[in-house]
């Protein structure tokens, strides 16, 4: 994968080249015999060991278990050849898993010093990745219990952006996005309750997809019905490959049994609503202002619109806080991040009537966006209206009190689509004058996941940005 207009991953790093390319490139390594799976996975584990201390993307690494799985993959390839990839489409592909998602062989700490028991079984998404042949190389960092949209916690410290280590990777799936961007895995699985896949994807210059609600089972289910499991990868094609493996019902998640239907047939010319949120920086606008013309050039009709989004505190924070209220015993509060503890305490103060009012606001927002989507096939906008801020912070300095969930003040474009359950994808739109990635978000109607992916692939090819933070080609190994 040739990189254009890119910057070094780390000044003085011993790893100058990203070890993992795309899923397609990784398959080609094995199919052409340029690398065995075992050699490639060994290179990945070495790169994590040598490079990750500078990023902080991983909180646990698989080690010998991953190498045993790699040896088994090599035996399968030697035995049946190319047919192995038809049976197991992700065979040998190194992936990572966010530390909120259960894995049977690696601890799930949830970014917290609080005690956690190792899961007895993989979450559905992890089990499906393994069944497709993917090799889990480690667990990636998150803010404590995913509470904030940056990835800083007392367990592992800050996760840094591979494009600029003094900047945040975003969150709460910041470790997943940073690991993919740095070439330490080909793909990762994150969670998204208010933008936690899309925000770090935008900041780190990778593709992140929050599918329609319950398209991928979430186990154990979340009471607030906001959380989605979603993939992060180097390209839209990689995300589509992952979705083919990850989707489908699971009886442990009742919502997944009634998940969305396949996408409707798309008209040749789509109606697209273009939104710009207040507070969009000049740097972000400078990257995204050309997107409406790109969409028009693809034959679509683009109209600049405004949508009256609901108050995020009433629509989101009260419900999240109520769900968190009993999540931490008072005697364990000294182990918690202050920001998450503020959420827990606020949740304890809420009355049942306040939570019902919050649900009414959510219903109003769903109705508002349903009416908008009667007029438009998709919406498009900058994923995040600002550039990545300081890596050690949980919010930019002007967001007065991060403990009050003020990521909603600097990232207003993501949370509404968790409330509505609509599919929303962030793909790289380009780089600012400081060389920092900017994301473009595409949003479809509930169930129109395939339509979002198809348009994203076209836009990706038109923008022609290879968003890999290195001035070189991805490398395999023998």
What are these regions (language model features)?
Residues 89-110, 269-275, 319-370, 382, ...:
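Short helix-loop capping/hinge segments that flank enzyme active sites or metal/cofactor-binding pockets
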Residues 37-42, 71, 283-306, 328-331, ...:
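Acyltransferase
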Residues 3, 7-193, 293, 298-299, ...:
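Gly/Ser-rich catalytic/binding loops embedded in alpha/beta enzyme cores
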Residues 121-246, 418-419, 423-432, 436-439:
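Short glycine/serine-rich loop segments
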Residues 44, 66, 239, 272, ...:
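Residue-level signal for inorganic ion chemistry
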Residues 207-286, 463-478:
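A short helix-breaking turn/cap at a secondary-structure junction
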Residues 44, 92, 131, 185, ...:
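Glycine-rich, small-residue loops and helix-cap segments
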Residues 26-32, 96, 114-115, 227-234, ...:
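Short, well-ordered beta-strand elements within core beta-sheets of diverse protein domains
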